[in-house]
Regions:
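Bacterial N-terminal signal peptides that target proteins for export
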Residues: 1-9
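N-terminal non-cleavable signal-anchor helices
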Residues: 6-7, 17, 216
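Acidic/proline-rich low-complexity IDRs
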Residues: 11-14, 348
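C-terminal segment of classical bacterial N-terminal signal peptides
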Residues: 13-21
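N-terminal, post-signal peptide beta-strand-biased segments of exported outer-membrane/organellar beta-barrel
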Residues: 20-125
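Outer-membrane beta-barrel porins/channels
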Residues: 22-45, 107-399
Length: 399
């Protein structure tokens, strides 16, 4: 799932054209390229987010479609997160960010215990964001450049997975991506003898994405997964309006987003103790569209490590993880942008054995005001519920 790149590009294009200090861009609020495929499932998030081989989630809320093969009967999943960012900068007067993302999935058997299908909904991703940059004209008039963004994108993924036996599962996904993103600019003069200037840009986006995945278990207690997300070709309809209505216009654009690979592994190190690892790669130098400066694009790398422990089969597991990301764009002077985040969480297996509730809290940071003139701190809360008629109170011991 990768529609969020459209939001990032639209916002960044406006900043590059207007803001005198691009170093002060909100990494979390504007540059959403590095966050577009993160799983919403709270258990997966608590284990690093990119560890797409967590068996109890049954593939419902993950991005490796092969995990769906573990669901043999009717199953469902619902999840979401909310986040708030605190931004500090040497140039920006105000920056606020609020996002939310929800996911629904419903799975059902297609053919005996071999084929399983699911249909779902991902969105509405709603990155409400605004910032303000103060300034003074050559004639001494004070003003604030204010940028606001709202709207979001959504997708409908359809997945089919096959169980090829004890050692391998495979799956494929097609996803219909749609969305609307609105950007608004306002030059607000504080004086009484000036006229404020406004402009609005609305982007309607659409694309179709494909994905595939495989999960193997070469030895007892070990699972390895590989997932692929295809290149996305977006069609973008743009409408722009200005204070001077004679300048209003509309036009069409295209955008190409590069493919991505995700590798994951799980190892049951001891009874009740499991180690998860994951990594992803995408070459964003192949990105095309929206007049984004190609000299600021780079490769994206993500690495995550997660631990889960259940004390004597407790229904309340302890989960924690760390993640390192090299985001797929650089600052104007060529400096690479990295993000470090940590997460912790737990869950509850219902006594009926047919459902579970999970929650996670993630903390992230980019930069430092002292060394980079900007700093972003993020707190994100996840919650999810999944259930299946096939589950029992006895805990799964596949890993």
């Amino acid at each position: 799932m990768r529609p969020y790149v459209v939001i990032a590009m639209a916002a960044l294009a406006g900043l590059i054209a207007r803001a005198p200090a691009p170093r002060a861009d909100s990494i979390f609020g504007i540059n959403l390229l590095g966050e577009r495929i993160e799983s919403v499932d709270a258990r997966v998030a608590a284990l690093g987010g990119f560890v797409q081989i967590v068996d109890e989630s049954l593939g419902l809320l993950q991005f490796n479609p092969a995990m769906l093969a573990f669901s043999k009967r009717v199953a469902f999943g619902a999840a979401g997160y909310v986040t708030s960012d605190a931004n500090q900068s040497a140039e920006l007067e105000r920056t606020t960010v609020a996002t939310k993302f929800s996911t629904l999935m419903f799975a059902f058997p297609l053919f005996r215990r071999t084929l399983t299908a699911s249909v779902g909904y991902r969105g509405h991703y709603d990155p409400d964001f605004d910032y303000s940059i103060p300034g003074t004209t050559t004639s001494g008039e004070e003003y604030n450049d204010i940028f606001e963004r709202s709207g979001g994108t959504w997708g409908v993924p359809i997945t089919v997975a096959a169980d090829l036996g004890r050692y391998a599962k495979v799956g494929g996904t097609i996803s219909l991506e749609r969305g609307t993103i609105e950007n608004r600019w306002l030059t607000d003069f504080t004086g009484s003898n000036t006229v404020d200037a406004t402009s609005t840009q609305i982007r309607e986006v659409s694309a179709t994405g494909f994905g595939a995945g495989v999960v193997v278990r070469p030895i007892a207690g070990v699972g390895i997964g590989l997932a692929f997300e295809s290149e996305l070709d977006y069609d973008v309809d743009v409408t722009e309006s200005f204070t001077n209505t004679a300048a209003d216009t509309s036009y069409d654009e295209t955008m190409v987003q590069p493919a991505r690979w995700i590798a994951s592994a799980a190892w049951r190190a001891a009874r009740g103790f499991t180690v998860y690892g994951g990594a992803s790669f995408s070459d964003f130098t192949k990105f095309e569209g929206l007049a984004f400066p190609t000299d600021r694009l780079t490769e994206e790398w993500v690495a995550a490590l997660g631990l889960e422990y259940r004390f004597r089969g407790s229904r309340f597991p302890v989960r924690l993880s760390g993640r390192y990301e090299k985001l797929p764009y650089t600052l104007p002077d060529g400096e690479e942008i990295t993000r470090v985040s940590f997460a912790l969480g737990s869950g509850l297996l219902f006594r009926t054995g047919r459902g579970k509730l999970d929650a996670a809290l993630q903390f992230g940071k980019i930069g430092s005001v002292d060394t980079n003139t900007y700093e972003d701190r993020q707190v994100r809360f996840y919650i999810s519920i999944t259930g299946s008629e096939q589950w029992s109170t006895k805990r799964e011991t596949r890993y």
